[in-house]
Amino acid sequence: MSEGLVQAASIIAALLFIMSLAGLSKHETAKAGCWYGIVGMTIALVATIFGPQSEGTLWIIIAMIIGGVIGVQRALKVEMTEMPELVAILHSFVGLAAVLVGFNSYGLTHETDPVLMNIHNVEVFLGIFIGAVTFTGSIVAFGKLSGKINSKALMLPHRHKLNLAALVVSAFLMVAFLNNPDNIFPVLLMTAIALAFGWHLVASIGGADMPVVVSMLNSYSGWAAAAAGFMLSNDLLIVTGALVGSSGAILSYIMCKAMNRSFISVIAGGFGNDVQVSSDEEQGEHRETTAEEVAELLKNASSVIITPGYGMAVAQAQYPVAEITAKLRERGINVRFGIHPVAGRLPGHMNVLLAEAKVPYDIVLEMDEINDDFADTDVVLVIGANDTVNPAAMEDPNSPIAGMPVLEVWKAQNVIVFKRSMAVGYAGVQNPLFFKENTQMLFGDAKERVDDILTALNK
């Protein structure tokens, strides 16, 4: 394949990637967006493998087949509830790839011009640094999301000074490397520091902020890919990495704004979020209810809002929830969904589940669109949500989630909370909502309880 054809293919692939991002921004065009991305990646792979500068084509194809088989098998087995940790582990692969490309590029450079050599060495150094941070950060995120690592924030003494020291030392190591490129020791030492830095960055971010971490790591992986593109002189990889990096950063900023969190604080590993942890002891008496009583309440309601959370995903309750929604709407009851920006474990988690269950898009509303309507609502069903409906965010300045905008479900006439137990949520704080006079608890598996309500509605 000629150089001109490769450049043309790269432009087409880049346009398809941009169209893919645009398509994924709306429910109606999301499927088309996926196909744009698939076609674009196929074109990019063919152009790269069969380009004029390509070597070892057979080994590349063998590696692609092995990776493809593993990827297809994993994709067929993965549950929707496991998607957040799958995304995190995929980000770690991008980071590791950038590190390996960096060391490989360092060993195979053929530059003779001193200026170009310095530029190349800067690319190598930064590429390895970003990749190493992304790699260990994503591994920690995977561990937290899968429950293998405690979700609480790691609060080391002088943690911000440690982060700053890591950056300063890495900067000095880069200067040392540029002054003596033949000495690889500064690069090896920087790699070790970057691996520890990435681990500490994500470990010091609490469970309540994990959806932001996923989008933040998405951004990091994009910049790691862009750095690899610079090292390989691959324009398409630079463009693609920049698209992923910038879109991930924008998404992180939007989510931080929705949570009243500082973007810099999340990027810096919890900087400036020193709060006193609230007690997780119960704060009063709670009332329990039954599926039959909830069904009767729903029959007599004129307006219902459902606020789903990660518990709905774990129980796979979205399908019976969609059936209840259809039944109530047939009765002329106004049913809508209120989605918190960080409900679940990754951006858009609840939207994906509801779309999977064929819930109409027009009744799925964002927090800002529906918060003012809770006061005029007869019944709110809180299915698997906890921290995102916690009034302590507004009422307790010492709470770890203080200041975070939440769904104000307690303003409704009746609130039904679906929970397995009275345990605290992912942020590790007690929820005063459970003890309010208009709140009733429906204990058990969310899917089983929703099925029981559906059975009672059909009687």
Where do the protein language model's features map onto the residues?
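Transmembrane helix-loop junctions at the membrane interface of multipass transporters and ion channels
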Residues: 104-115, 179-185, 212, 219-240
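Transmembrane alpha-helix boundary signature
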Residues: 48-61, 73-83, 99-115, 181
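Interhelical loops and loop-helix junctions of multi-pass membrane transporters/channels
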Residues: 80-136, 140-159, 262-273
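Structural signature of hydrophobic alpha-helical transmembrane segments
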Residues: 1-14, 51-69, 120-135, 181-193
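Membrane-interfacial segments at transmembrane helix termini in multi-pass membrane proteins
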Residues: 243-301
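C-terminal ends of transmembrane helices
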Residues: 16-31, 68-87, 138-153, 197-210, ...
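Structured cytosolic domains appended to multi-pass membrane proteins
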Residues: 282-459
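Cytoplasmic-side transmembrane-helix entry/capping segments in multi-pass membrane proteins
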Residues: 31-40, 60-62, 82-94, 153-164, ...
